[in-house]
Amino acid sequence: MTTTSAFMLSVRLDNVAVVAIDVPGEKVNTLKAEFAAQVRAILKQIRENKALQGVVFISAKADNFIAGADINMIGHCQNAQEAETLARQGQQLMAEIQALPVPVIAAIHGACLGGGLEMALACHRRICTDDVKTVLGLPEVQLGLLPGSGGTQRLPRLVGVSTALDMILTGKQLRARQALKAGLVDDVVPQTILLEAAVELAKKERLAQRTLPVRERILAGPLGRALLFRLVRKKTAQKTQGNYPATERIIDVIETGLAQGSSSGYDAEARAFGELAMTPQSQALRAVFFASTEVKKDPGSDAPPGPLNSVGILGGGLMGGGIAWVTACKGGLPVRIKDINTQGINHALKYSWDLLETKVRRRHIKASERDKQLALISGSTDYRGFSHRDLVIEAVFEDLPLKQQMVAEVEQNCATHTIFASNTSSLPIGDIAANAARPEQVIGLHFFSPVEKMPLVEVIPHASTSAQTIATTVKLAKKQGKTPIVVSDKAGFYVNRILAPYINEAIRMLTEGERVEHIDAALVKFGFPVGPIQLLDEVGIDTGTKIIPVLEAAYGERFSAPANVVASILNDDRKGRKNGRGFYLYGEKGRKSKKQVDPAIYKLIGVQGQSRLSAQQVAERCVMLMLNEAARCFDEKVIRSARDGDIGAVFGIGFPPFLGGPFRYMDALGPGEMVATLQRLAALYGPRYAPCEQLVRMAERREHFWTNGETDQGN
């Protein structure tokens, strides 16, 4: 065997070469620039061995093929030319793999993403396992980039242009059966026979060429291609609002390769990669990626976590059902649900059944896996089965005496080490723990709805919470697949506190006569996934506004909502999507009607509904209040760092990722510009816009939230 660090070459007795990929000291394989020489040395040996019948590339890691290229390489590039050179080096290496004179097979188990899939595309055939960990995709667009090692050229020719555009523009990941159906892989086999199946495929003297589906062949022609690209450009522009330049360049590069040939396509790909790497959008998106990676590694405290073998949940409603699902099906932990009646328990069980059954129908998992995961969830109307639970999460009504009662019951019926975690969105954790016998084991664990989709959780220790309780709760959140940030026990915590003034200002502009659709469109244009009015409808107007009085009582008039407006809307039985009528009209199944905005809303609040502000003015009024409040949270140490503040806003409320989060955005604007803008708005609209002391100090000292050592690279 010849060993060259991350790549190991061995030749079997049947004259098939096996290249095992195993990056030393890393949990996952990532491609680095220094590996090029190692791979070329192996390719040279393969070319010189005339007896070889084929080659198999396979990972020696337990559950991943290649997770992508090392993103730090991009951060080391000083200009577009250096990044372009990096792409061309990758293209050349993939071309050398493709040019090998014998069949080359990629044997894929686990994640095959980014540069990993580009390497697999350079192989002549691909075979993968049917494991749930096996996913294939090109997610570079999520970093403001495009695939730079030939992916934009090879993928359309393999699976067809429409499928390739969909994959590259969205960064979506295909599971094994989806990849087989798309033609991305040639076979799907159990992991136990992956290597042997790949070897047998490599031994075949002639590998049959795959024929594209009729639809893809039509779209590959000049007329079909012209129509497709016109539609894709229009749809993409509507979705990105011009905020993500990578999507436009992806379309251009793929079209160039199909219209002018792969050589021109590779040139266009490398140039676009270099230019995109230097854009502020890519730098911000990479910063979010590195920050989220760091947060996921953060243990929350210096203490070791306590035992975490099973979990209890109080309440089988929407939140309780979602928490049960992520705990059992994502975390693999046994869950016991307690509700006051069997209907609540059945609701929670059905919640998990519906989600798992959808996965079965889509062939993401097998029915046996569904049954195995569902078996982890059980329920009762009393505390039977709770005595050994390591952590209990309450998801009951926002009622302080009720939650205090839950603490007492858990302390009576569970083990002395059991942690009590409250899913409250507004009540102080210290108040919930006020009468606790073991207050050091009481903590907040705030999930966002829908639980199965929203990636963020806030972990909220109160003054007496122990370091071990924090560490154990953070560990649970990570097992649930969540990104946890630890925040202080102050009214609204972090996410809801910065969201409230943003939504309040949108409602205030509504009372000034601005139209609902104009307000929402302005914030979508700015970069939010939905506008503030639609967000309130989605969350539930009653639920979303419940925290306003709490915040107003804690922080004063800057959190007051427009007088009587919210009450008028709620008194008219408008709760949003959940009851079919809010600011928007909804059909029976909760879908928006063609009419969308309910015109009666303007009469209800006593305005005509005629917009006078520009989209930029609307966005500025909402966003500047959010930024100012985020700076206050930083000053008051509600969040531990700018990193946590950025991740909380991006993952919790959809703050535009291409801006990097509120703190990177404020740094980009500059504290002086922030203060000047807020002072201008305060003169126009009142003292709620007065810049906070933190921003004023930073402007005077010319400071930033992110220090010079905290770049867009991983540490």
From Swiss-Prot:
EC number: 4.2.1.17, 5.1.2.3, 1.1.1.35
Region annotated Enoyl-CoA hydratase, chain positions: 1-190
Catalyses which reaction(s): a (3S)-3-hydroxyacyl-CoA = a (2E)-enoyl-CoA + H2O; a 4-saturated-(3S)-3-hydroxyacyl-CoA = a (3E)-enoyl-CoA + H2O; a (3S)-3-hydroxyacyl-CoA + NAD(+) = a 3-oxoacyl-CoA + NADH + H(+); (3S)-3-hydroxybutanoyl-CoA = (3R)-3-hydroxybutanoyl-CoA
One GO molecular-function entry: long-chain-3-hydroxyacyl-CoA dehydrogenase activity
Keywords tagged on the record: Cytoplasm, Fatty acid metabolism, Isomerase, Lipid degradation, Lipid metabolism, Lyase, Multifunctional enzyme, NAD, Oxidoreductase
Source domain of life: Bacteria
Main function: Catalyzes the formation of a hydroxyacyl-CoA by addition of water on enoyl-CoA. Also exhibits 3-hydroxyacyl-CoA epimerase and 3-hydroxyacyl-CoA dehydrogenase activities.
Known partners and oligomeric status: Heterotetramer of two alpha chains (FadJ) and two beta chains (FadI).
Identification of the protein by name: Fatty acid oxidation complex subunit alpha
Biological source species: Salmonella typhi
Name of encoding gene: fadJ
